[in-house]
Swiss-Prot record:
The keyword Cytoplasm applies. GO terms for molecular function: translation release factor activity, codon specific. The keyword Nucleotidyltransferase does not apply. NCBIfam families: prfA, PRK00591.1. PANTHER family: LD18447P (PTHR43804:SF7). It comes from Idiomarina loihiensis (strain ATCC BAA-735 / DSM 15497 / L2-TR). This is Peptide chain release factor 1.
């Protein structure tokens, strides 16, 4: 049987589902595109949990009918009732588990696109090369999922890869999966320039920030912003020598700096840089709030802090280890070609288990 508090919550969701269903048929809602889109999204989110709850209620009715039948004078009917009751109880357990997962608190950012930031850390040129490997891995993962990747800014490494690269990843549910990639990534391998065959260790930092819609973005006082323009470097032919199209935004109160030079238009570069800046400031505010809440439960969503090592890629052993859940796979080639769901599926399962534990603690 479901916990009474969970059942009350589900009944409230059924009422809201019916309310949203009625609202979607009203002319003033249909004519308001933003409201209609918002309610449609809420309706589709409620639909699955309400459908599952209806199955659960039907299951309870089936069990009650089977219990009545189990008291019949006919032995054959009693045997049939016992079999039905056994099957219904098994289905009840599965439905309860499904409902609990559907009721887990959802991150409102999960369905959003995101900004991916990769920075080379310790290890010099080898760290920059590894940053390039990570970006290629994420690009292939995005391709497998039908997501789009656009580079916002990039600083090339001297011998390949990137000292820093920022990209925009767009598609359904991008942030919900990519957010688990934030943190320190370490590589152990023999560099091509190493004549003695010694294994070197290098590191990169990955930060994943949700793209905040303009209507919800943090307001930035223009007086708090320093804007610098400069000539773009890299590909672009003569154009890069003629115009100061590159933009550097500095948010003075926080010291956050964002550069963008990928577009030929200064206006477009500024818009992209502002979106990244707003995402970073939002992240700072979220981290501050989280610290104030002082959560004692582990958080599998990384902060992007370089000191927070989340994964090691060992080339000689073809091994990849995720330190948050002590998962080791000897399938490095598959992971590097974009099959990171091998790791992410396990992390998300663990994350949901942590949330379920917190949910049950709150009901005790």
């Amino acid at each position: 049987m479901l916990n009474p508090s969970i059942e009350r919550k589900l009944e409230g969701l059924v009422e809201r589902y019916q309310e949203v269903q009625a609202l979607l048929g009203e002319p003033d809602v249909i004519s308001d595109q933003n409201r209609f889109r918002s309610l449609s999204r809420e309706y589709s989110q409620l639909e699955e949990v309400v459908g599952c709850f209806e199955e659960y209620r039907q299951n309870q009715d089936d069990q009650a009918a089977a219990k009545d039948m189990a008291e019949d004078d006919d032995a054959e009917m009693r045997e049939m009732a016992e079999e039905e009751l056994k099957e219904a109880r098994k289905a009840e357990e599965e439905l309860e588990n499904r409902l609990q997962l559907l009721l887990l608190p959802k991150d409102p950012n999960d369905d959003r696109s995101c900004y991916l930031e990769i920075r080379a850390g310790a290890g010099g040129d080898e760290a920059s090369i590894f940053a390039g490997d990570l970006f290629r891995m994420y690009s292939r993962y995005a391709e497998k999922n039908g997501w789009k990747v656009n580079i916002v800014s990039a600083s090339d490494g001297e011998h390949g890869g990137y000292k820093e690269i920022i990209a925009h990843m767009s598609g359904d549910g991008v942030y919900g999966r990519m957010k688990f990639e934030s943190g320190g990534h370490r590589v152990q391998r023999v560099p091509e320039t190493e004549s003695q065959g010694r294994i070197h260790t290098s590191a990169c930092t990955v930060a994943v920030l949700p793209e905040i819609p303009e209507a919800e973005a943090v307001e930035i006082n223009p007086a708090d912003l320093r804007v610098d323009t400069y000539r773009a470097s890299g590909a672009g032919g003569q154009h890069v020598n003629r115009t100061d199209s590159a933009i550097r935004l500095t948010h003075i109160p926080t010291g956050v700096v964002v550069e963008c030079q990928e577009e030929r238009s200064q206006h477009k570069n500024r818009a992209k840089a502002m979106s990244v800046l707003q995402a970073r400031i939002q992240r700072l505010e979220d981290e501050k709030r989280q610290a104030e809440e002082d959560s004692t439960r582990r958080n599998l969503v990384g902060s992007g802090d370089r000191s927070e090592r989340i994964r090691t890629y060992n080339y000689p052993q073809s091994r990849v280890t995720d330190h948050r859940i002590n998962l080791t796979l000897y399938r490095l080639d598959e992971v590097l070609t974009g099959d990171i769901d091998l790791i992410l599926d396990a992390i998300i399962t663990e994350h949901q288990a942590d949330q379920l534990a917190a949910l049950s603690e709150g009901q005790q």
